[in-house]
Every structure is written in C-alpha cells, then in structure tokens.
C-alpha cells in the first residue's frame, strides 16, 4: 500500500459503503465485487452473539479451485479469505477417488486468458446464499511497536511463503515434464532471458534453446500469497476507497459498451469474448482490478448524465474509478501478471496533469511495460506452450504497449522505453484479432475497420519513434544532422500514406471516426518532423538557403489537422477522442499562430478561422480531458497578445538555425573534398557486390533484422537491399553530389539543388513493415505533395521531377517568391509549379490555391535577427516542445493558473 492511501488509524465513523444492506443503491453488474464485510474492532458478532471457530479443510474450496487461486481453507478453516471477501458460500468438494472425468465437480477444461481461467458459463446460475459460518477477523500480518520499530521475526505465513519460494528454481530446472507442459494460465509465466545463468541449466537439460517462456510451478503464487493475508487495516483501506463497489448494472453495462466501442480499438488488450463471458457469470467474474480499470476508461467515452458534473465533465467519475483501481493495485490484490498489465495500461486513461511526474499516463505505461517484460511479452511466443488465443492476445498487448510508449514520449517529451532491438515479437496480422476458441466461435468477430486502424497505427508509431530519435533525442544534438534523415522520414511517411488501406483512408468527403483519428496522428507526426526544420521566417538580410519546404509541409499538416477536427466536431465525435488529440491540436495551434505573420490578408483571415476552429474543439475536448482546459487557457492568453505571439514565432527558428549551420558546414567540407586532387583509382568504375559496405544510414534503419520465429516469411516480405554500382561508403557522398556527382546518381533538382541521391532506395527497415521496400518510383520521383492525399491539392510546390541537372539550375528561381497580394504565384514562375489532383480542398482552403509564400515575414528592423527574441522575452530560453503546460506558462511569463478554476466561457472572437 502506498503511504498516501493508507490512514494510520481506522476512522471511528461507520463505513456506509461497506454494509451489505446499503449496497443495493450500487448493485454490481457481475458478482466480481460484492462488498466484503466491514472489519470489526471486536471479535464478537454482536452483543450476546457467539463466535465460532472455523471448520478446517484438507483441500481448496470449490470457488478457489475453479478460479485457480490460492485457498487458505486448509490452514485457517472454512470460510476461506476469498469467500469471506466476496460473500460467496465456501464449500469444500467431496473427494472423488479414481472417478471418470466429467464427474469431478466444478473443475473445467478451460483455456486460460489474461483475465484468469474461464469457467463454463451457466445460463441460469443459482443464487449464491450468504455464508452461515461466522469468522474471526484477520489480525494485521505485521505488528507495529509503540516506538515504530519494525518487527524482527517472520509471521507464520511469511515463513511458509519463504520456504515455498526457495524451491522455485529447483522445480524449473529438475522437472522436465513441467517445463514442457502446456501453459494453462497465461498470467503465470516465468520468463528466462538469454543472459540469465538459469537459462543455461534449463536449456542444457531440456534442449529447448528457442523457448523462453515457462509455466510457474503450482506452489508459487506470486503476490497472491499476500492477497490471502489482507488484514483489517488493508481491508479497511480498500473499503474507504470503495474498491469493492460497482455502479448499478445498467450503468455498468453502458460503461463497458462505451469502452469496447471507443477505447478498445486503440488499446486492444482484452479478449472481449472471455471478458464478457466472465462478466455475465456470477460464479466466475472477471478480475476486479481489471473491471474497475475498464470502467475508468469507459467514463472517457460515456454520455450518461449520471457520470457528469455540472459542467458536463466526466472527470470526477473517472477519478473515482481511478482511485478504486489504484487502491486494488497498491494492495497487490491481483496476481495474474497479464491482468495487471491490462489494468495498468487502462489506468493511464486518467490523465489530468502532464506536469505531474508520478502516477500519470507516462508512469502507468512505463510500469505496464516493466511488468510485461518481466513476463517475457517482448519475446516471441510462437514456440511457447501458450494456447493459440493467448498467443494472439500477448501480441496485441505488446504492440499496444509499443504504441503507448511512442505516443506518450512524443506528447510529454519523454524518452522512449521500448527498444525493438530487445524484442522479437512478430508484427500483428488480421488473424491476431480473432478470438475464436477451439471449442467455440466468438460472439464478437473483429471489426475490419478497428483491425486496420490498429495495424496502421502501429506502423505509424514506429515512424514516430524514428522522428524522435533523429530529430529530438539528446544524441541527435551532438551529431551532424544529415538532410537525408529528413527525406528518408518523409519518404517513410509518404509510403505509409500510399499503402494505407482504403477502409481507414481519410478524406474530407469520406469521413469516418477511426480514419480521422488515424490521420490526425499522421499529420501530427508530419508537424513534429518538420517543426525541427522550419526556418524562422524570411527576411532580406537572412534569406533561407534551404530549398526543402518544411514550413510549407508543417502549415499544410496543421491545416489538415484542423480540417479533421472540424469534421469530428460536425459529427459530434470529439468527446470520444483519446488524450493524444490534445497534442495534435496543440501542434496545429502553434503552426497557426506562426502563420499569422503572413503579409497576405487572405492567409491571415483563413488562419484566424482555423484558430477559431481549433480553440472551439479544444474547449469541447476539455470537458473530457483536463489537460485540454490548460492548453485552452494558454492560447487564450497568447492569441491577440503581440508580444507573446512574437515570442513564439521567433523561438521557432532557434533550432532551425543550428541545423542550417550544420548543413552549411557539411556543404563546405564536401566542396573542399571535391576540389582536392583525385586519388589514382577514384575514377574507376567499381562494381560493389551485395557483401560490400553499404552507405551509412541512421542507426534505427541500418540495424539488422530482429530475430523472428518465421524467418522465411520475413525474408520474403523484406527483399535484400540492392547495392548501387556508384555507391560509396562515405556518408556524405551518399547524398551530397554537388556539381561533381558520381555517375548513375539522380541529378539535382529545384527541390534539392545541393544534394544528389543514390539511384536505388535505401533499405528502410521497419520492424512493423509487412510490405515491400520503398518502390523505385517513389524514391526517384518523390515530391513533398505525396505526403498529402490527392484531394488535399497541396499548393505551391515546385515541380520536383528530375528534369534538369545541377549545373543548369537557375538559382534565381530558387530564391524567395514574393506574394502578389492574392495568394497566387507570379506569371513568370507559374510554369515551375504544379498542383496535384482536382479533388476537394480541405475546409479553409477553397479559393486559396497558394496559401503561403516562402517569405512570410516582413523585413525585420535593422539589427534584429529572425532567430533572436523580442526585447521583452529575455534571452536564451528555449521554446517548450511538449504538452507540459507548466513549461509553456513559464515560457510566456504567464502567472500559474489553477486548471480547476479556469473559465471556459470566454467567447471565441
């Protein structure tokens, strides 16, 4: 128990929620959480009542045996602790000696799930009568002296557990039949990694070098040993937290339905078929910890008025379920490791204060990953003895952890936790979402839209991780920044968009919630990538030498995010979005504030409309996510405040200036190398074979393929890279050709006048990628407008096809293009630009085919650098890059505001 949750003494007032006769107002849906009797300070039941000794048993009771949990009826008598806690009749089955199978009482042949084993569903279960046996309350397992000195002796239960644990390794190594036995409880798996010395002994004896998952011995129950010793203090704390309470049946049903409709597709970590079967079975209910966590996540998408406060927010209800789930977790109430991982992931749906570094979404997702890796979820289970349905569930859980790891790292500016070099879990397939079992067909077949959404979301999250490592990691600041990292990331994103299945491909005329959510994450990744390369704004004294249109791409991506949000608002679906949509809107708002500096009045008007749309959406989202209220208040202070707007706009260019200086240095070094005397064999045409050194690539792309249980399939999906005849080992010469580019490299274009690219695409190895490598056509003819759908009609992009050589370039055509006051291009340069498609423009683009010009900023005053701060902003402070709202308030010099007292009734405009 955490010290903050456990009161030092029991409170004298009665515990209303603990009394069975008062539980009718919150009747639970299943029997998973009947309220245990309130701990009493007296051993007698009532005045004049008689206390009876427990009847001792020689074996586990029926309930504990059916659920495969530890039963203490043999040591403490009937009723056991579990039956007392859940007010279930504690019955010891009669011994059946040498009887045929099928007559042995309640034991069932079941396929274990993360949510414990499933019992056979009884369509008409008999009502459970309360136990007639009295019980003596459990005394605390640890006694505290008056002076606070801890005890120095073990209790009987602790000594018994220590004796059992001492033989765990012996059971693993010396029982061959045990290590090869089927794993019937997926939540009780021992993982042995390769570096463990114990692995040598197990593999040497069993000869199973590819197996890393083993069933835990039956006598090892993990934290369950502590659960059976919950004393009065711990039970009292759980009662005070309401951990055993559930909403009325109808409301519980509604919350669970909302969870599986709006949350489960994003975090598909529960086998819905088994969960619902247990939910309807009072004799074999689901884990109480998991159920409270599901209810927590369900509040984020439930519209029931019973859950809302006066402002229409479900935050108080979410906090209630969060505290209940957290109390159960802190008490070690659950010992099924997979159930714990599932619950920890869902506890991250309580996300209110991103500036809090403990018990927020970052904390819970990291703890879930640690528990999962402790059970070996990061390793392939294809060779394990898990059932097929459990193997599928484990894969879904692992890749869900991966998506949470990347998205939380992006939103909060934290380092990633999962290194795919340490994992060999195969990429998900459509079959992994099937929940059919060997003897029954699932009543919840997978939704194709949900399946494709998550598959594409996993792929997008890997690219998101590449952007983080290459553009925002600490290591990226210390190494030379290669322009090819930017183009490679863009090509990976363009390839993702081109291969996105039509069923989840979002366009304005074809709105769907899951496609909209998927593509909002895609455009947020684009903003993240190109924000690191955005110039501070053109001026006569500081022209931008880079021809890559990062600013254009970032602005267009922000416009697409706004368009998606407008469609979600029109369909009344904003409240169902996860918390990451706050970060997406945050990114779009920053881009819109930055674009307000355009001297073109029409662009300013369109940008103001977008700001209004984003602020309106943020206001609506803040009813569900408190962090949205913080961002809303922040931009209410920024918009219209010229000093704060200028501070944000100027700070954007600091990072770009560093990158630009690095590129300039690289170009100068390359130019000097080209002017140096050629070596004797430099002009010889050398044919590099496939075994010769390949051009240097970023670490995450060049690493070898992770081990896979099905190597043949992987190799068929990932063709070996083709070596370029003109390739050189030098990283600089791989993409910097200058005027003396080597033969058979792509000629320079207006898009990349200083860079020439190898004629064959690099091996962009992505673990989640199950399509062929980048096509030759995409590599040779890539244009930034391929980052957007045809219907987006990305304006004012140069024709980037390789139509001329670097030597014949007209450098005057690559300079800043002034606006003509109408958002169009001058006639003499119109031929150098093309527009893709004739589709529908995003909302806010109609009538503006060229929404910005390279020179957005008016000339700055003499002596004012575009990378410098305004006179009122101070020097040296870096612009925040995450959702830590407290950092943003400090950055703008705004006095801290209590988010619980923010006024959301400010008119927009």
Curated annotation (Swiss-Prot):
Its main location: nucleus. It is found in: Nucleus. Residues 12-30 have a biased composition (Low complexity). Residues 110-119, 669-683 have a biased composition (Basic and acidic residues). Residues 142-156, 704-717, 737-755, 865-878 have a biased composition (Polar residues). Disulfide bonds: none annotated. GO terms for molecular function: DNA binding; DNA-binding transcription factor activity, RNA polymerase II-specific; zinc ion binding. Keywords: DNA-binding, Metal-binding, Nucleus, Transcription, Transcription regulation, Zinc. One of its GO terms (biological process) is DNA-templated transcription. InterPro entries: Amide_Lactam_Regulators, Transcription_factor_dom_fun, Zn2-C6_fun-type_DNA-bd_sf, Zn2Cys6_DnaBD. Residues 1-51, 95-159, 651-757, 841-878 are annotated as: Disordered. Residues 61-90 bind DNA. One of its GO terms (cellular component) is nucleus. PANTHER family: FARA-RELATED. This is Cutinase transcription factor 1 alpha. It comes from Fusarium vanettenii (Neocosmospora pisi).
């Amino acid at each position: 128990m955490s010290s903050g949750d456990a009161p030092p003494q029991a409170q004298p007032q009665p515990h209303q929620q603990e009394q069975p006769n008062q539980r009718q107002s919150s009747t639970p849906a299943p029997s998973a959480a009947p309220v245990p009797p309130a701990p009493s300070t007296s051993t007698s039941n009532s005045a004049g009542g008689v206390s009876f000794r427990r009847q001792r048993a020689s074996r586990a009771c029926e309930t504990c045996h059916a659920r495969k949990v530890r039963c203490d009826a043999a040591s403490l008598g009937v009723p056991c602790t579990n039956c007392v806690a859940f007010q279930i009749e504690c019955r010891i089955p009669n011994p059946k000696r040498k009887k045929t199978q099928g007559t042995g009482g309640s034991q069932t042949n079941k396929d274990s799930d993360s949510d414990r084993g499933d019992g056979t569903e009884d369509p008409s279960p008999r009502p459970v009568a309360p136990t007639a046996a009295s019980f003596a309350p459990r005394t605390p397992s640890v006694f505290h002296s008056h002076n606070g000195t801890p005890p120095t002796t073990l209790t009987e239960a602790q000594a018994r557990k220590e004796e059992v644990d001492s033989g765990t390794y012996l059971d693993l190594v010396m029982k061959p039949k045990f290590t090869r036995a089927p794993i019937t409880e997926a939540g009780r798996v021992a993982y042995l990694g390769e570096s463990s010395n114990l692995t040598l002994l197990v593999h040497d004896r069993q000869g199973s070098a590819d197996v890393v998952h083993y069933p835990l011995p039956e006598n090892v129950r993990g934290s369950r040993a502590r659960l059976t010793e919950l004393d009065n203090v711990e039970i009292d704390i759980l009662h005070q937290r309401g951990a055993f309470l559930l909403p009325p049946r109808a409301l519980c049903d509604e919350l669970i339905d909302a969870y599986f409709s709006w949350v489960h597709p994003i975090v598909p970590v529960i086998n819905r078929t088994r969960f619902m079967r247990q939910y309807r079975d009072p004799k074999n209910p689901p884990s109480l910890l998991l159920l409270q966590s599901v209810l927590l996540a369900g509040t984020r998408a439930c519209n029931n008025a019973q859950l809302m406060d006066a402002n229409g927010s479900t935050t108080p209800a979410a906090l209630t379920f969060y505290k209940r789930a957290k109390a159960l977790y802190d008490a070690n109430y659950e010992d099924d490791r997979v159930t714990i991982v599932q619950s920890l992931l869902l506890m991250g749906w309580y996300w209110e204060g991103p500036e809090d570094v403990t018990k927020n979404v970052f904390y819970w997702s990291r703890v879930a990953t640690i528990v999962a890796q402790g059970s070996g979820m990061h390793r392939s289970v294809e060779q394990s003895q898990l059932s097929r349905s459990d193997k599928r569930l484990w894969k879904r859980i692992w890749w869900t952890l991966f998506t949470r790891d990347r998205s939380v790292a992006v939103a909060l500016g934290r380092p990633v936790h999962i290194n795919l070099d340490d994992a060999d879990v195969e990429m998900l397939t459509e079959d992994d979402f099937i929940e059919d079992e060997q003897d029954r067909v699932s009543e919840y077949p997978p939704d194709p839209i949900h399946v494709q959404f998550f598959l594409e979301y996993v792929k997008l999250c890997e690219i998101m991780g590449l952007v983080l490592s290459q553009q925002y990691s600490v290591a990226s600041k210390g190494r030379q920044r290669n322009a090819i990292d930017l183009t490679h990331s863009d090509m990976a994103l363009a390839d993702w968009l081109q291969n996105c299945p039509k069923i989840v491909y979002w366009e304005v005329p074809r709105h769907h919630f899951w496609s909209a959510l998927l593509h909002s994450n895609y455009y947020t990744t684009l903003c993240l990538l190109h924000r690191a390369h955005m110039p501070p704004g053109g001026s006569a004294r500081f022209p931008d030498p880079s021809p890559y249109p990062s600013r254009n791409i970032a602005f267009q991506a922000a416009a697409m995010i706004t368009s998606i949000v407008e469609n979600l608002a029109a369909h009344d679906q904003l409240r169902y979005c996860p918390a990451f949509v706050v970060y997406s809107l945050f990114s779009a708002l920053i881009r819109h504030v930055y674009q307000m500096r355009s001297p073109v009045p029409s662009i300013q008007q369109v940008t103001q409309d977008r700001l209004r749309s984003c602020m309106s959406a943020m206001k609506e989202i803040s009813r569900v996510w408190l962090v949205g209220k913080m961002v809303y208040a922040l931009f209410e202070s920024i918009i219209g405040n010229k000093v704060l707007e200028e501070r944000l706009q100027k700070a954007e260019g600091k990072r770009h200036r560093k990158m630009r200086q690095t590129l300039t240095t690289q170009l100068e070094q390359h130019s000097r190398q080209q002017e140096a005397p050629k070596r004797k064999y430099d002009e010889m045409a050398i044919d590099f074979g496939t075994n010769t050194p390949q051009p240097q690539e970023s670490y995450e792309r060049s690493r070898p393929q992770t081990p896979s249980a099905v190597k043949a399939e992987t190799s068929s999906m990932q063709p070996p890279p083709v070596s370029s005849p003109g390739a050189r080992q030098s990283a600089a010469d791989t993409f910097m050709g200058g005027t003396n580019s080597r033969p058979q490299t792509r000629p320079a274009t207006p898009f990349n006048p200083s860079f020439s690219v190898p004629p064959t695409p690099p091996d962009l190895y992505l673990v989640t990628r199950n399509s062929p490598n980048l096509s030759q056509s995409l590599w040779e003819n890539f244009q930034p407008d391929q980052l957007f759908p045809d219907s987006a009609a990305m304006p004012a992009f140069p024709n980037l096809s390789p139509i001329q050589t670097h030597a014949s370039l007209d450098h005057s055509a690559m300079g800043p293009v002034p606006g003509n006051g109408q958002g169009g291009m001058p006639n003499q340069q119109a031929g150098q630009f093309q527009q893709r498609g004739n589709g529908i423009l995003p909302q806010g683009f109609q009538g503006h085919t060229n929404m910005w010009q390279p020179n957005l900023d008016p000339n700055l005053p003499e002596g004012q650098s575009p990378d410098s701060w305004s006179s009122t902003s101070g020097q040296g402070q870096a612009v925040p890059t995450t959702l830590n709202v407290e950092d943003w308030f400090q950055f703008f010099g705004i006095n801290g505001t209590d988010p619980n007292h923010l006024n959301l009734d400010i008119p927009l405009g």
